[in-house]
Curated annotation (Swiss-Prot):
GO molecular function: 8-oxo-7,8-dihydroguanine DNA N-glycosylase activity; class I DNA-(apurinic or apyrimidinic site) endonuclease activity; damaged DNA binding; DNA-(apurinic or apyrimidinic site) endonuclease activity; double-stranded DNA binding; oxidized purine nucleobase lesion DNA N-glycosylase activity; zinc ion binding
Residue intervals of every FPG-type zinc finger in the record: 251-285
Listed name of the protein: Formamidopyrimidine-DNA glycosylase 1
Cofactor(s) this protein requires: Zn(2+)
InterPro entries to which the protein is assigned, alphabetical: DNA_glyclase/AP_lyase_DNA-bd (IPR015886), DNA_glyclase_Znf_dom_DNA_BS (IPR015887), Formamido-pyr_DNA_Glyclase (IPR020629), FPG_cat (IPR012319), MutM-like_N-ter (IPR035937), Ribosomal_uS13-like_H2TH (IPR010979), Znf_DNA_glyclase/AP_lyase (IPR000214), Znf_FPG/IleRS (IPR010663)
Domain of life, source organism: Bacteria
Co-factor binding comment: Binds 1 zinc ion per subunit.
GO biological-process terms attached to the record: base-excision repair; DNA repair; response to oxidative stress
Signal peptide region: none
Catalytic center residues: 2 (schiff-base intermediate with dna), 3 (proton donor), 61 (proton donor), 275 (proton donor)
Amino acid sequence: MPELPEVEVVRRGLQAHVTGRTITEVRVHHPRAVRRHDAGPADLTARLRGARINGTDRRGKYLWLTLNTAGVHRPTDTALVVHLGMSGQMLLGAVPCAAHVRISALLDDGTVLSFADQRTFGGWLLADLVTVDGSVVPVPVAHLARDPLDPRFDCDAVVKVLRRKHSELKRQLLDQRVVSGIGNIYADEALWRAKVNGAHVAATLRCRRLGAVLHAAADVMREALAKGGTSFDSLYVNVNGESGYFERSLDAYGREGENCRRCGAVIRRERFMNRSSFYCPRCQPRPRK
């Protein structure tokens, strides 16, 4: 699933190309792509038609377009929330595989914005905007914590939350209610950089070490963002269909059997929450039982 850097790459591409444009036509090619929009595909297409795109925003792994739509009495602002799922893509112009296009929108300048999704886990929905902790976010996103790249992210406050958690640190890093945007890849990378094993119970770690993990998460995601994100296959691409190349810089994730770039020990892989965790047994020793 795309994590914060990959979603932010897509958001920036959309911000540059669709802000200020008006949606003139929408077609839903697969009903699963709008299953999260409770009112159904006909309602979504009717409300999107004629809507002006005011801008784009993101929290964690969730992306949305802020729209100005025609209300009953006056224009109202609403959000087109985009969930990329495992393989969702927001593409501008020509699409490499038209068979995977689930939704297409025509803009007033002739641009076609397509939502392609090979596995059909993602989708679009329209949602009201609400103010939460000083930020305007769509209702489905309101429960998410701020992410490490949010200017208002409070590292000390998150550390205090983690100090109260009596489960594995990595499990907490993946909990979007604690800190959003971090997925399996960047959790492993942040833990490697901070020399902390994710199997440690969060509450047993000192504030300094927890803070180091959060700072490492922010650092590695900024670096990934600068390189277009991490693409292990063709499923993650930017709005122009181009893959990121940060996978070449990964220090832990996906490197089972390879030497640690810091100490030379062999990177290990373990099963964790139906996923895989990658770590260095020397730099990141497991907690003592």
